[in-house]
Amino acid sequence: MDASYKHPVVAVVGPTATGKTALGVELAKHFSGEVISCDSMQIYKGLDIGTAKVTPEETCGIPHHGVDILTPDKAFSVADFTAMAGKLEEEISARKKLPILVGGTGLYVQSFLYGVRFTEEKAPAGLREQLAAELAAKGGAAMYEELKQADPEAAAAIHPNNQVRVLRALEHYRATGKKLSEQKAESLPPERPYRSLILGLDFPERAVLYRRIDLRVDKMLEAGLIKEAEHVWQNRESFRTAAQAIGYKEFFPYFEQTAPLEACTEKLKQASRNYAKRQLTWFRHMDGVVWLDAGAPDAVQTALRKTSEFLAKG
């Protein structure tokens, strides 16, 4: 094989509630593919409803990797993801199958496709404890404000309430004196490791997306989200990442009897809409995304055609 040959990889990206899972399955059916999930929460076992995890029925028998691999008390970083996804890509390609990335965690998708090399610096002794103490004393908003001043680019990619990632970014900055974005630039290889097609799903009218998000939340509640969220709340000290996740933390005031269920539900819908906006901002800044109208009757056919053309160029 030509030494310059690069494995083809297809990615399906976009904000929440745009039909990424279904499109990924359709592509896998037509092009003999296997799916690698690019969702930072779907890796956790037992967090099924709040993460909109793909169901066995929805997979239609297509292998889905990177789902249900850790218990919620375990940490999982973008460096962990790129290592896992790199190994999966090799295995899938060796089986003569097409690797299809599906998910809305932009940092995961971009880091993998761009071949970012992560080096895990060891934090100075006591730094993590110091940051945790500062968080307890000052609050999350103050810590996020510090990150905005130190590393605006990293802050823009992190939700203010995601205290785990805020502290991790601050830890990196204080330990190395460098921004995360600087590390990322230094760790980029001279050329990308894969030949990729990135399909982005979105709706031309924002109101359509927001209605779909609201409907999805209602369906999650019907499916038993409250019970799942209560389990996270009861284990919030050990389920650190899950306790910060959209879909769970919005209901904590309800369990603490400080807010009615209706108010918490509305808060979740608003948080999900805001998250969709941040996802769109991220993916709009990525190079080479081929955007598709998720609501168009021929959206799947267009995606199949684009993928067929992409593979034919190989």
Language model region names:
Residues 1-314:
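Phosphate/pyrophosphate-binding catalytic cores of soluble transferases and nucleic-acid-acting enzymes
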